Amino acid sequence: WKTAQKMTRKPVKFGNICATCLPMMLWNDHYKTDQAMVMDIAAVMNEEYIALADAGCPVIQIEEPVHHFNCQMEPPCTDKDLEFYTNAFNRQTKDVKTEIWAHTCWGNPNQQSFYWERPSYERALPYFMEMNCDVLDIECASNQARDAKLFKNIDWNKYDKKIGIGVVDHTRTTVETPEMVADTIRRALEYIPEDRLVITADCGFGREGLSRRIAFYKCVSLVMGTNIVRKELGVEEAYVATADEQFAFV
C-alpha cells in the first residue's frame, strides 16, 4: 500500500479477499472444519488490516463475503451458515481504525458474471447489514437497480453504514450514458437516503482485461450521471475534465 500511495496524490484504497471466500481455493489438510480455518485466517488478516490502518491507509475494501453466492447453492446455505459468514467478516475487521468497504457482486471471471440472470440479494441482506463495515456495495447496474427496493424497510437509525450501488456494468463493453447512470441513482434514492448513498461500479475493470478506454469512459459516465442527480438535489457538482469544452479537439 505504501508503494502504491507514493505514486499518486489521491488516496489509495487497499483491496483484499474476504476470509470466507478462501475455502474454495485452499486445501484444508490441518483443520477439522473449514470454519475453523476461516476464523484463523480472519484473525491473521485482522492483524494486517490494523497494521495498514496504522500506516495511514484511508480505506480497506474486503471483497466478496460469500453470503449471497452461497444462498444460490444447492442445497442453499442455512441461517446458521449466514451468521457464521457475518461473524467471520467481523473478526477480520475487529478494532480496525480506518474506513472499511465490503464489496459484493455476482462475479467477474474473465469479465463475466456467474449468472445470466442476476439473482437477488434478498436473503443475504439482513446478514450483510450486521457486518462491521462503513460501506456495503452491491451490484445494481446489471439489473436496473432491482434490488434497491430491498432497503425499503431498513431502520436507518439502527445502522450507520452507507450503501454503495453499482451504476456501470463491468460485464458489458457498451458504455452507459450519463442519463442511464442518473436513472439508476434515482431508483436507488426511492429507498436509500441520499446521505447514505455511495455511487460506484458493479465491480472492478482492470483485473479481467476490460479495455482501458472503455473503463475510462464508464467512469466518466459514472461522474457525469451522478452530476445530473446532484444538480436535481441542489448539491455541488463534481468537475469532469473530460467533459470540459476547453479541452475539445473540435
Regions found by a protein language model. Name each.
Residues 1-250:
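Domain-level signal for soluble alpha/beta catalytic cores
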